């Protein structure tokens, strides 16, 4: 675990809070959740949605996307300055699904962004409530992480698609703030930095002038965020080198890719938060639950309890398996896309299978899909146990891993051995140990070589019964390590396209 000296807890990042005690943090996170809930209730009223339609996850996604778009200032400004055919920069909308005469119908709605902003602020006591917006972004990001494998994006930046366990938060928008930065994986940060360096290589003016100064500040800030995720001195020292480079170029890209690979064994600290769709918070608020008074945490038992008592529905395409659709959303809700499947299965109480074996496509329905054959079903989002979400990468050791994904990034603080395929990973480290970072590289490679399989991560941490709210009696599960643990194993998941 990185030291907690100057760091704020996630919940503080989540609510832009200064230092608060646990009760205050729980209250401010609760306030954020109830704001989302109140907004959702109001939108369902505006759109005249029935209770069932309001609990449909596709409707929830459209409503969430509308409010995020209404508050996306940079894009709104861009749209006004570059008017494109048939797109009104002042309006936002999307598909809303209603049940008409025993069939699901798609209705495209359009609203003034100003009106959406008004409803959102009203639900949040007049505030912009950016924390709530970021929360929804992280939920969308977690859903993307579970649904898509970022092979193409990885290959484009010169990284290995098998490093997908480092890509948490790769679709988060830049404006997602400190809370967003906390949940980004090492690979995501590396990819953002490489894109930046490549622009600098291709565009002479990228680092120059007033704009270039801003660019440089952003570059150094991103380097510091990434540095803060690493848990070993050598990795951090190498990040200092990358950050201080006068003119970032191919040498820095090499260093970053080296660091990303090293993170498969010497894992970084990446935060995990359970962010649920707005259609979970809405009905809870409507039923009279006072999140602010009761308090709420994104990393404890609260999201599990909430899902335990929630009814969420989803549209299902003709050849999809509703149980598989449920697994996809369960993983997204618990931020578990890169967790060891054996751990997820134990906590969920039903087997969690790799992405390639799921008979389901993403949750969103494209505008050209035929609605006549659409059914809907209940998503099973309950769990057998609960566990605390981690923000450390755990310590490092070795197990069998797979062709498609050669390491994992833990979500739950549960005692276990962490799987990774050492031979495959180490094979990438042959040769190139010269240059100015050679001593650090040698040190990092040595640490990776010495990573022991028998070391246990999260000593003594276990899972808890749902009745054990105080986490008093940990159950330390034993896992069958002969089974496959990677989700994106030899995978055929769809690609994420903006």
From Swiss-Prot:
Late in virus-infected cells, may be cleaved from a 56-kDa protein to a 53-kDa protein by a cellular caspase. This cleavage might be a marker for the onset of apoptosis in infected cells or have a specific function in virus host interaction. Keywords: Capsid protein, Helical capsid protein, Host nucleus, Host-virus interaction, Ribonucleoprotein, RNA-binding, Viral nucleoprotein, Viral penetration into host nucleus, Virion, Virus entry into host cell. GO terms for molecular function: RNA binding; structural molecule activity. It comes from Influenza A virus (strain A/Hickox/1940 H1N1). It holds the Pfam family Flu_NP. Residues 8-21 have a biased composition (Basic and acidic residues). Residues 1-21 are annotated as: Disordered. The gene is NP. It is found in: Virion; Host nucleus. GO terms for cellular component: helical viral capsid; host cell; host cell nucleus; ribonucleoprotein complex; viral nucleocapsid. Encapsidates the negative strand viral RNA, protecting it from nucleases. The encapsidated genomic RNA is termed the ribonucleoprotein (RNP) and serves as template for transcription and replication. The RNP needs to be localized in the host nucleus to start an infectious cycle, but is too large to diffuse through the nuclear pore complex. NP comprises at least 2 nuclear localization signals that are responsible for the active RNP import into the nucleus through cellular importin alpha/beta pathway. InterPro entries: Flu_NP (IPR002141). This is Nucleoprotein. GO terms for biological process: symbiont entry into host cell; viral penetration into host nucleus. Belongs to the influenza viruses nucleoprotein family.
